Amino acid sequence: MDLLKGKIKPLYAKYLLAAFGSAMITSVYSIVDTAMVGQYHGPQGTAALAVVAPVWNIIYSLGLLVGIGGSVIFSMKRGSEKESGVENQYFTVAAIGAVLLSVLAWAGVLCFDRPILTFFGADEALLPLAREYMRPIKYVFPLFLFNQMLAAFLRNDKNPGLATLGVLSGGIFNVAGDYFFVFTCDMGIYGAGLATAIGSGISFLVMLTHFISHKNTLRLVKPERPVRKLREITVTGFSTFFIDVAMGILTVLFNRQIMKYLGADALAIYGPIIQVSTFVQCCAYSVGQAA
């Protein structure tokens, strides 16, 4: 697969299918989470997941910031004859940025989950359910950021199929695990969180196999002027980051207003709408990421 000399339509179609498949399964298993928890806990469970929704916007946006920003520059440098050979410096800086951001996000979720979820719209009735869902997720929280970053770099390292396989494998486990943990094991909303946490670990492990494959050209190297390169990455990825963060801010505003004036039952109706809008947003992302 020659990105410089290959025909545009077949190349784009291959990357579009990979990106669209990843986006679709990510959205579908969020919808399944909502459906399973709603069946088990009723409106309170669906409302609790609506409160958690902005958490995903934040962690995914941080992953896209370094993933999209770094992988775009990675491809540009690889395609430039004058600058070929420096692309892995951007991969290294993106990986360092991902570690720093994940540590900050992880510390925030571990130490301040109660005030964060309260700010996102949880009241005293929804807070225990939201925290119960987040309990297993907190321990693997950085993996959600790394999965976004790795998927972006794998697509630009001529392995979009593995990026899709990683997301699909984690997503399929999540769907099956939801039913098993929530109903068969009678774990309720905690089981949905556990399935999501294990699914993210599976996705991460599958994508890591790229680094032992013959297709891999990604290397950790000593970067020159890392701060400058990190600034380039954040500037390039900022537009994608901002779209996701803006969606999260909008969700928080809706959550708070709905809880203030209408209550948890109304928020339970809004929860599935969030998932559908995320699905549409992910489909739009896939078109841009394929390009």
Predicted regions, residues:
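Transmembrane alpha-helical core residues of multi-pass small-molecule transporters
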Residues: A53-W56, L101, S169-N174, A195-S203, ...
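Cytoplasmic helix-loop-helix junction between adjacent transmembrane helices
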Residues: F120-A130, M134, F141-L168
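Alpha-helical transmembrane segments of multi-pass membrane transporters/permeases
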Residues: A98, F153-Y179, Y190-A197, V287
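Residue-level signature of transmembrane alpha-helical cores of multipass secondary-active transporters
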Residues: Y15-A23, N57, A98, I137, ...
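Hydrophobic transmembrane alpha-helices of multi-pass small-molecule transporters
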Residues: I58-S61, N174-D178, F204-L208, T278-C282
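Helix-terminus/linker motif at the lipid-water interface of multi-pass membrane proteins
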Residues: V28-A47, L117-E124, F180-M187, F241, ...
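Short alpha-helical transmembrane segments in multi-pass integral membrane proteins
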Residues: M1-A19, F74-P142, T184-F238
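Small-residue-rich hydrophobic transmembrane alpha-helices
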Residues: T46-A107, F144-A163, I269-A291
